[in-house]
Amino acid sequence: NQGIPQVVYTNAFLWSPDRGIISDKNTLTYPTTLRQTLFLNTGIQGAAAIFNRAMCEVIEQPLSYYAMHDHVLLLAGICFGEVHYLHESLMYYRQHEHNVTGNAPGSIAKKIALMWENRGVRLVNREHYEGLKAFYERFEAQIKGDDKQVIEAFLVMKAESFIVRAIRIIQYKFQLF
């Protein structure tokens, strides 16, 4: 449908020059709502994404801050159009020590170990918080009611206590993957 912004993501093999294929899937979750997305730091890699002209017209509007291009693409798809996923891995996503988002750990055991190792790290990093805030400031007038409430609830959590954050997460049914 060329009338609405659409993005299609494909999966990717995680690949390392030293080890070959680390994992046959880079993406393990497929968010289509803000409630599923906001605590992911928009963890869908956009290297294997395609989008239509209507999406291009949305994302070419400048923001005051960008976390990553992937972040804006997913937010725009969720707020203004459609997000689709092809679950097949269609490319190799190279892992190396200088990746902007860091190396993907590969196995489930390594992912759990990494989560334990980083247990003191905030759930949402500053860059993605500021990117969401800039997106909201730019598109506030166009964002629909429920999505607007979800973003506003998410943004105010930064200043709230742990207990209030936990209540808000339950109240708004945010997913913590």
PLM segments and residue spans:
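Nucleotide-sugar donor-binding/catalytic module of glycosyltransferases
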Residues: N1-G106
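C-terminal subregions of glycosyltransferases and related glycan-biosynthesis enzymes
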Residues: F39, Y65-A67, V72, R94-F177
